[in-house]
Regions:
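Structured loop/turn residues at beta-strand edges in well-structured enzyme cores
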Residues: 33, 66, 125
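Canonical radical SAM enzyme core domain
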Residues: 45-58, 79-123, 129
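Classical nucleotidyltransferase
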Residues: 124, 128-143
């Protein structure tokens, strides 16, 4: 994880709406999907937010343990940052936390690509819950 950085659009220390249980959320910058009615449009830019070391992100996550049950990767598009997130995910799992990931890519697409990319395979293997497919406002649940 030494000297690796991630373009981060935002970070929530504690969230109850981005997966099951209290969790931290890493919002990455950059997305090519251009979903209609995207709820995080500003995060589509790969330059939005701040370049943060994976070490610093992990320290922030660790500061929330034992309160949190897991970490969610959202964005932007997490799968645009496969190499960085696969390294971060490995460290998160060593803390005993679960990982959720929201991606605009479909599970079918990921299945086709997974054997072509070692880091993708490693990342997907670390994810406990994958929420796939482009954002569709008609499927949004309002409580």
């Amino acid at each position: 994880m030494e000297n690796k950085y991630l373009q981060v659009a935002g970070f929530l220390d504690n969230s109850l709406v981005n997966g099951l249980g209290l969790r931290s959320v890493v919002f990455v910058s950059g997305c090519k999907h251009n979903c209609k009615e995207c709820q995080n449009k500003e995060m589509q830019s790969f330059c939005y937010g701040d370049k943060i070391s994976l070490k610093d992100i992990l320290k922030r996550i660790e500061s929330n343990v034992p309160l949190i049950r897991g970490v969610t990767f959202s964005g932007g598009e997490p799968l645009e940052h496969i190499k960085e997130l696969s390294s971060l995910a490995e460290e998160i799992k060593s803390l005993g936390l679960n990982i959720w990931c929201y991606t605009g890519y479909t599970f079918e697409y990921i299945k086709k690509e997974i054997n072509k990319n070692h880091d993708l395979k490693k990342l997907i293997g670390s994810i406990d819950v994958l929420v796939d497919g482009k954002y569709d406002k008609s499927k949004k649940i309002v409580l």
